[in-house]
Amino acid sequence: MSDRLTVLTSKSVFTGTGDLPFEGFVAVRGNRIEAVGTKCEVASYLTQADEVVDLGDRTVMPGLIDVHTFYTGWALRTLGSDLSGVADAKEAVSLLRAWKDDHPDCAAAFGHNLPETLASDAENANTAAVFDECFGDIPVVCFTPGAETCVLNAAASARYGFTSQACYAEKIWRMMSDFLALPEVRAGYSDYMSMLNERGVTAIKEMAFDDYYGFADEMARREESGELTVRVSMMSQPVGAGANLAYAREARERFRGPFVRFSGFNRMTDRGVWAGLAEMIDPYEDTADAGAAGKTVVEEPEWDLIENELRAIDADGFRYSLHCQGDGAVRRTVALYASLPRDEYGRLLRRHAITDLENSDPTDLVEFGKLGGICEVYPQILTLDRREDCLSMMRRQIGETRLLHSWNRRGMEDSGCTVCCGTDLPLLVPSLGESIYSACGGFFADGLPVNEANVLTLVELLRAWTAGGAYDLMREDEAGYARGRQTCRYLRARSGCVRPRLSRRTRSFG
């Protein structure tokens, strides 16, 4: 490692743990932090420095930590043959055949960027029929841009057990062993890390379904060969079977290096309010869609399974992240966590978390804070929608009063919960500017606000992206600004004067 000393000076240094940025410096020797201090302490480092970089009013801060990512979902966007230029299914067949000829050991033919016109409700069956005719018993799966929908033939449906209407990551688990083994998918992890690094992300909590279907070997290889530029805390999300504690114990022992660790388990409880699948404390409004009117949830989550898994996971020393969108699911989860062993201060022994928390009752946030709970929120989520498109649906489903309890990051922070940030990548791609715009300003994509009393301050959000994420990943002794830790990121904006409405222009760089 180089012994070169670089000193970064800035009018705005944010450590991730303090309340305010300060004028000061960060001294970096090689790729390790040697010192952090105020402007009064910089002189001796300037005299030793091989290079001094004055960043002016740009903020110097630790790398961002994204606590909810899916490489398995990201990889679908470039899986197989690029079909973006095809005009019809027959043209797609030619490209798919060429790809399959180049991949004789792969059980299926895959494609991406299939034009939406060939996957729409009207044409999906016709495209699938062409694939049936031309490929017979060879499975064919082609994803549209963004991999939100797909076309698959009968052979693929039989082998993988999902449909074109539901081809998101949790549904395609039977396909993972086929595509995660592909050389280009394994090589693609380098581009994935580069994308994260370019956005200031230096650590992630990665959702690795079941036993990761062979991809854990790739992570071990990259750790051993020094090819990782992102610290990865892997979570097993049970989809093909229940929580595999035998695999978890093995992974905990296997991954003990500076980059890859095994963190525990992740599971969905309920789902979206729009579909009546978010479990609410009180029934949905009489105006609710999707058959939810008068019910607290259309399909009850598997609470017995979740409770049994949680107790076994906790007893074995692992942590669990439970994904909750409705206030009823949040309440049930807080109660489950409260029933687990705690320390002398009443705090959970394991770092159990709740992910998303789209809607939550403030009293449950207070109880979760007493437990030392962790809230993994999606700070950019409002940027996906226009305000009235989202709020009109929410009003129909849960009404105006409960709408006020949505995206309540203020309540989480004030209740003493540890708040940290995730993107559900590839649903969202990490963007510090977008997260300030959404989580500090409360703005939707069209610039109109919601629940402004529920937002975080800028410093609270930056802390969530850094120190909060480090605590969630159990890496607080490795991340942040302390001697010996790896280097930082800087922002093209002063943290003290960024206005949320203008923050979308804020970017992070390595």
Can you describe what each PLM-predicted range is?
Residues Q48-A49, L228, G257-R261, L348-R351, ...:
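A short helix-to-beta-strand connector/capping loop
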Residues H68, G372, R489:
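Active-site-proximal glycine-rich helix-loop-beta segment
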Residues F70, G257-L277, G373-T383:
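Non-cysteine beta-strand/loop elements that form the S-adenosyl-L-methionine
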Residues G136-D137, R254-P258, T287-A288, V366-L391:
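Extended low-complexity acidic/polar segments
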Residues R222-S225, E250-V260, R347, F368-K370:
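Acidic (Asp/Glu)-rich catalytic clusters
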